Amino acid sequence: MKNLTHLQRLEAEAIHVFREVAATFSNPVMLYSVSKDSSVMLHLAMKAFYPAPPPFPFLHVDTTWKFREMIEFRDAQAREKGFELLVHVNEQGVRDGIGPFTHGSNVHTHIMKTVGLRQALDKYRFDAAFGGARRDEEKSRAKERIFSFRNAQHGWDPKNQRPEMWKIYNTRVSKGESIRVFPLSNWTELDIWQYILQENIPIVPLYFAARRPVVERDGMLIMVDDDRMKLRPGEPVENRLVRFRTLGCYPLTGAIPSSAANLSDIVEEMLIARTSERQGRAIDRDEAGSMEKKKREGYF
């Protein structure tokens, strides 16, 4: 492997992880959140098993508050690529009227994402689940293994993890336990964008700069994506040139001012970026809703 480029080494590692899981687990799944990382994961999964399709389904946990363009892109990719798409919604949360505006980011994320994910994993009895998390994103993710052990309640205990030496992974689990698998652990945000550029991977158009209706709220530029977003008194809607570095539920995801309208522009922008992509995620902002706490409860 000494003649491989940096991106080729990362690609080879990720493909090895995909094949290791397919060979050792009985019922794996890939979480497909429709993010740029998910798009890279989909591309790698297709490569890993070509010309056969990936030997596992793709799961989308729908909070009912995702950007409309994300859902359109998700369905288009499933049709084009022909993979098995499972969509799960926490119906009890919907009946209870749980939402980011009425209940806040912490309750909404816990009920509609964390509990929703646990419901789906239990329903289909998956014993391994791929995710697109990377160690450079956030400090709790920086200490997580590529093969991250979860107990029967889907909880993560950072003190109860397995060593990973020489690319040898312990894939054994008892009944009810599972492993979260992160093939992109060693990638950076810049690596992701350079790989997307190199491989010409389709991504949600929201990642590219365009004029969009946004309001400035709580230090974030929130896009008005549908009529469920109620404006505060004196809060103007402005059409500004923005893009998104990260995607999630639209009321909890901040845009950034940017003129990067193509992949080359985004890579150039990333070369001078000095802030985390997750600065635009409201769910990471308060201690009560910290990422590590969410992961201990079963969040990805």
From Swiss-Prot:
Q: What pathway does this protein act in?
A: Sulfur metabolism; hydrogen sulfide biosynthesis; sulfite from sulfate: step 1/3
Catalysis: reaction(s): sulfate + ATP + H(+) = adenosine 5'-phosphosulfate + diphosphate
Class of enzymatic activity (EC top level):
transferase
EC number of this enzyme: 2.7.7.4
A Pfam family cross-referenced in the UniProt record is PAPS_reduct
Sorted alphabetically, which InterPro entries does this protein's record hold? Answer: PAPS_reduct_dom (IPR002500), Rossmann-like_a/b/a_fold (IPR014729), SO4_adenylTrfase_ssu (IPR011784), Sulfate_adenylyltrnsfr_sub2 (IPR050128)
For biological process, the GO terms are:
hydrogen sulfide biosynthetic process; sulfate assimilation
Q: Name the domain of life.
A: Bacteria
Ubl conjugation is among the record's keywords = no
Keyword Chaperone attributed: no
Keywords, A to Z? ATP-binding, Nucleotide-binding, Nucleotidyltransferase, Transferase
> Where in this protein does the record put region Disordered?
281-300
Single annotated GO MF: ATP binding
Question: According to its UniProt record, which protein family does this protein belong to?
Answer: Belongs to the PAPS reductase family. CysD subfamily.
Q: Which NCBIfam families match?
A: CysD, PRK05253.1, PRK12563.1
Q: What does it do?
A: With CysN forms the ATP sulfurylase (ATPS) that catalyzes the adenylation of sulfate producing adenosine 5'-phosphosulfate (APS) and diphosphate, the first enzymatic step in sulfur assimilation pathway. APS synthesis involves the formation of a high-energy phosphoric-sulfuric acid anhydride bond driven by GTP hydrolysis by CysN coupled to ATP hydrolysis by CysD.
UniProt subunit comment: Heterodimer composed of CysD, the smaller subunit, and CysN.
This chain belongs to the protein called: Sulfate adenylyltransferase subunit 2
Q: Please tell me the species this chain comes from.
A: Brucella melitensis biotype 2 (strain ATCC 23457)
Q: Please name the taxonomic classification of the source.
A: Bacteria, Pseudomonadati, Pseudomonadota, Alphaproteobacteria, Hyphomicrobiales
Q: Supply the gene name.
A: cysD
